[in-house]
Amino acid sequence: MTDGAQPAAPNATNVLAALGLPAAALVQQRVPKKLLIDNGAITAGDKRVITDGIDEIHWLASLKPSTVGVPTFVDDGEPPVREYLEVAVLSRQLRAGAKEHRIAELVHRSIPYPLLLVLAQPGAMSLSVGHVRWAQNEAGKVILDGTPYEARIDSSTPAASVSALMQSLALTQLPRADLFVLVQGLIDALTGFRASLLTGPPNTPPTRERAAAQRLALQRCIDLDSQIAQLRGAAVKDKQLPRQVALNLEIKRLSAERADLIASLGD
């Protein structure tokens, strides 16, 4: 590596090492694409996304009571909404130009377990975690609950943030009361990483409550970025001075709100 060059993005091997799992939890099996197509693809377009975008699929590990010593989870609903018997860790090697975000969602839909997914492609890696629940209208079917929470790393990502993320993924650092709490801990780790891209690495890992507040602030920042971009585009096109002034004032107001949110993300 030359002076000043960014380190390469981590890969699935690095993530697995960071987790620090016991040998009993390792699976290391190849998964056929047909599993994703049969269980996750909704349209012909989704099938093409999987077929054209994914090179290799591997089931890296299975986290359950017998392999990592973390109890299962069943909520107290009648009937239960969630039952976590294990958490899967999968990796996907993507081809250049693959639709990364869509593939992540399709993979999470196709696996009937809460999932930590590693998507690797040349020069970049993304991690995503999603909760699951029982389907309300189809007995015995497990579905993705909401949108997977994602974080992306590439060669431009600050090394300190990547290092802090890898440390926060260690099984010994994650909450282990039950598998639901473990999954939420993984989501909180990704939240802390995304916040660190705006504020710098935290001095201490965020609490569950702090991570929840960070997720709300991060989503609001994304919404504000979109609004600001639209307003700037409108200001460039609008030739009327009063309208330009009004648009620029709104941009200034939203930018100030964004700055306050970023300040709130820090320790």
Residue ranges and their predicted role:
Residues 82-216:
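Extended, non-transmembrane interaction/recognition domains
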Residues 205-208, 214, 218-267:
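Alpha-helical oligomerization segments
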Residues 37, 42, 50, 54-57, ...:
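Weak global preference for isoleucine
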